[in-house]
Amino acid sequence: MTALQTIAVAFAMFSALPMPQFDWNEKNMRYALCAFPLVGVVCGALWCICGVLPLPAAARAAGFCLVPVWVTGGIHLDGYADTCDALSSYGDTAKKLEILKDPHCGAFAVIRLCSYFAAYFALCGCVAFTPRVGVLWTLALVGERALSGLAVAAFPLAKNTGLAHTFATAADRVRVRQVLAVLYAMLAVGLTALGGWALVLAAGCVFARYYVVAKKQFGGVTGDLAGWFLQKCEIWMLAALAACQWLGVL
């Protein structure tokens, strides 16, 4: 029962899918970050369904683009927008953290979101769906969430409040780090075996930059930064996937 509740906690927090109502406690939150990658399985499955439907190219690209947003409810995009606003302020750490708490959407966030969706839609239009590509992208969607959870459990926290702090302090951080690190290593091996080494490379580069930006600009990670990372990781892996197909290596 605790395992099912743990999965439900992860889906209730990181997706828009309806979940049973129950009290969150130390037991069912301890490994919620380990269940977070399962949201990627749902995104990948729906992405594959969109890929096999007899849709016009533009409609299929739109479906590819919108599936993650529909499943997650835009929680990661919200963090991406807030972080873009904070980084664009060029203020000190305290100023950036204050902007992250601001519920309003600034001009830079709107500009970055419009640019993000334009690029994402274009890249989706460049991807030709095949069963192999479907498996690759599903593994990638699971992997980016494993890295995101790993960062929350391993990186320093920017503040002692907020979503990242709540999940990090509730977690068995050592065990969560071990589980997610092993999971991502297995996913990386699977991606590489299927010819998706470029996606692994892209994710690794974004993950490294995430650590540098989080520590240098904000003093550590926050929930908003976790969302920013996930969206950046996703679009760069998508670019790597499109590039591999264009170059004929997939």
Stretches with model-predicted labels:
Residues 1-24:
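Membrane-proximal soluble regions of multi-pass membrane proteins
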Residues 18-24, 75, 95, 149-159, ...:
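C-terminal ends of transmembrane helices
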Residues 9-12, 26-51, 165-169:
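N-terminal beta-alpha supersecondary unit
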Residues 34-84, 135-139, 196-216:
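Membrane-embedded alpha-helical segments that form the functional core of polytopic membrane enzymes
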Residues 185-231:
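Terminal transmembrane helical module of multi-pass membrane proteins
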Residues 67-105, 213-233:
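Acidic (Asp/Glu-rich) catalytic motifs at the cytosolic membrane interface
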Residues 29-46, 86-132, 136-137, 175-190, ...:
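Multi-pass membrane catalytic core of lipid/isoprenoid biosynthesis enzymes
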Residues 146-180, 218-222:
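Solvent-exposed interhelical
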